[in-house]
From Swiss-Prot:
The keyword Cytoplasm applies. One of its GO terms (cellular component) is cytosol. The lineage of its organism: Bacteria, Bacillati, Actinomycetota, Actinomycetes, Mycobacteriales. This is Ribosome-binding factor A. GO terms for molecular function: ribosomal small subunit binding. Keywords: Cytoplasm, Ribosome biogenesis.
Length: 164
């Protein structure tokens, strides 16, 4: 079992090797727009999980996930041999490719936040147009005794019975 620091160093090295091989050495059109995001290595250094994301050719184009997955699976052996040559470890880890869905989660959160901001703006508009119900001052002024016939002035602010 390797220590965690060694596993992290190996993962970083694998990430660099795979990313540069995809960008410069492997000439598969399905790998256009593939970006290596992260690599996780098991504690025994025998398996490496490579997380990738795919971008479209332009900002308006949708990414082609199926072509990228197929191209990565076709290049898996070549990439593993390049990792073995570049790392110098006794056992070259097997590579597993998993699409990173963080960008999808971020886009979904941005959409939810935009909807919440729009709802807040609607509530603010309703609040600006709202008027209080009833009269302008529905509460009685404590100094006013108008309309109180037969009530002793000393009993107006008392909380106990009117017959003191």
């Amino acid at each position: 079992m390797a220590d965690q620091a060694r596993a992290r160093r190996l993962a970083k090295r694998i990430c660099t090797i795979v990313a540069s091989a995809i960008e410069f050495e492997i000439k598969d059109p399905g790998l256009d727009g593939v970006t290596i995001v992260d690599v996780k290595v098991t504690a025994d250094l025998h398996d490496a999980t490579v997380f990738y994301t795919v971008m479209g050719r332009t900002l308006e184009d949708a990414p082609d996930y199926t072509a990228a997955t197929a191209a990565l699976n076709r290049a898996k052996g070549t990439l593993r041999s390049k990792v073995g040559a570049g790392t110098g470890v006794r056992f070259t880890p097997t590579l597993t490719f998993i699409r990173d869905t963080t960008s999808d989660s971020v886009a979904r959160m941005e959409e939810l936040l935009a909807r919440a901001r729009a709802a807040d703006a609607d509530v603010a508009q309703v609040r600006l147009r709202a008027k209080p119900a009833g009269e302008a001052d529905p509460y009685r002024d404590k100094g006013s005794v108008a309309g109180l016939v037969g009530v002793d002035i000393a009993d107006i602010d008392d909380d106990d019975l009117t017959d003191d």
